[in-house]
Amino acid sequence: MSTQKIGFFGLMKSFDSAESAFETMAGGGLTATVKHELMRGVTIDHLIWWFRNIDQTTTFNGGDFDGAAIDVYKLWHPHDHIKVRWKKKITDDSGHIQPGSVIGIHETFGGFVVNESSLITQFDREGFHFQMGILGLKVGHLLHFYREIDGGVLYETEMEIKCRAPLIGKLLTWLACRFFATEPKIRAWMQHNIEECGESEKFIPQLYEHSRTVNSESGRRVSASECIPTSSH
């Protein structure tokens, strides 16, 4: 059992706080699933807002918003997260991020460095899903499922490494599992995923509410300025 890390808000979740499974798939490939403890006080609105704004900064210090500026991504996992950014944004008329968008993730866990771009295949009130590829072909996915219940959100993550393309699928699966997504790397990711998701309830609701307050106050200032009569000459 690994030693629990200390994040910005105290002890991070231990590996055994979640239900997890790792499997070698028939015909090649790997799959890992993590069912997290209830994210207490978190809602679907919080999570959707979070993923849309995951590349932003904040001054939240755990108590108020008078701290130094920091990437919100680093609050999620201060030890492992380096940088995240939306490399391509496809939005609807309301500005909501749509499938086809691309997110770039730079992080490290268990001695493994990740600096990759992933295609968003679903982003709605049921899940936030990525597709991973080699040479333009899908070789795996990372799925985030969430469901709101009384008291919080049930959150489950699934990673699968397997290419189902005809003819070269088995070869690409072997290459991916041999060089890019090895068993030790996937197991290290599972620990990382449990730790970062466990931090969500400690700061995402606060950032969400602060954003709503700031936007509301900004809207009131705009409305007031629009109501100021101009003098006529």
Regions found by a protein language model. Name each.
Residues 1-31, 149-233:
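Terminal "cap-and-tail" regions of soluble proteins that handle hydrophobic small molecules
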Residues 136, 146, 151:
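Active-site/pore-lining binding-face segments in mid-to-C-terminal subdomains
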Residues 35-38, 116-121, 141-148, 158-161:
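Hydrophobic/aromatic beta-strand elements that line small-molecule binding cavities or substrate pockets
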Residues 2-90:
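Hydrophobic ligand-binding cavity/cleft-lining segments
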Residues 70-137:
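Glycine-rich portal/gate segments that line the openings of hydrophobic small-molecule binding cavities
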